[in-house]
């Protein structure tokens, strides 16, 4: 049975790392990249542990097996997460509803990933709805960025209600900054 929960064990962090590595852009064939989507950032166990100390991430399990994750990334994680710090720097002045994002109380989605055998089964929505349940009382917005080449992820985020607010290019990719408004 599928159920969403917060990360609570070291084993779950290890399972997140394993799923992350299996779905990295550089680990997939061009066909898989196009059809299945991908993740761009590599997460070490140490980095996951530090992020978890700030705020637990959300996972979906099928009985005891972790089949999806959505990493909670508070802005403070930018102090030890280089890629996240770059993202935060790039989006601080992005405007949302006439105000800079920096004027909102928001946190970031560090990454979302679902085991390929479980895609299309509602896990994406389950992960994000659990984020909303846990964090919407403390935050106005959930912000993330998605590779413009990751069409599957862009469609899934739009379907849930995320709105693209800004597009930029860095040394890695072209990124769409998307916002889920909980106000």
Regions found by a protein language model. Name each.
Residues 25-45:
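Conserved GNAT-fold acetyl-CoA-binding loop/helix
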Residues 45-59, 75-82, 108:
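A short helix-loop-beta-strand connector motif used in the catalytic cores of GNAT acetyltransferases and
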Residues 169-183:
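C-terminal "cap" of GNAT-fold acetyltransferases
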Residues 71-111:
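Conserved acyl-donor/pantetheine-binding loop and adjacent beta-alpha core of acyl/acetyltransferases
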Residues 125, 148-166:
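Conserved active-site alpha-helix within GNAT-family acetyltransferase domains
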Residues 114, 120-133, 159:
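Conserved acetyl-CoA-binding loop-helix of GNAT-fold acetyltransferases
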Residues 1-22, 26-27:
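Conserved N-terminal entry element of GNAT/NAT acetyltransferase domains
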Residues 105-109, 135-147:
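Conserved GNAT acetyl-CoA-binding A-motif
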């Amino acid at each position: 049975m599928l159920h969403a929960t917060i990360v609570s064990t070291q084993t779950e962090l290890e399972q997140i790392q394993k799923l992350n590595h299996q779905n990295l852009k550089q680990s997939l064939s061009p066909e898989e990249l196009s059809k299945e989507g991908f993740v761009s950032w590599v997460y070490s166990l140490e980095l996951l542990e530090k992020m978890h100390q700030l705020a637990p991430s959300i996972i979906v399990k099928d009985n005891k097996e972790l089949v999806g994750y959505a990493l909670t990334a508070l802005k403070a994680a930018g102090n030890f997460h280089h890629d996240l710090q770059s993202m935060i720097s790039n989006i601080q002045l992005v405007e949302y509803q006439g105000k800079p994002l920096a004027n909102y109380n928001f946190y970031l989605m560090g990454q979302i990933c679902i085991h390929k055998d479980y895609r299309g089964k509602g896990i994406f929505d389950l992960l994000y709805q659990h984020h909303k349940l846990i964090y919407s009382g403390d935050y106005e917005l959930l912000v993330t960025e998605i590779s413009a080449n990751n069409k599957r992820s862009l469609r899934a985020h739009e379907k849930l209600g995320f709105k693209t607010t800004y597009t930029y290019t860095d040394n890695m990719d072209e990124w769409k900054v998307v916002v889920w408004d909980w106000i």
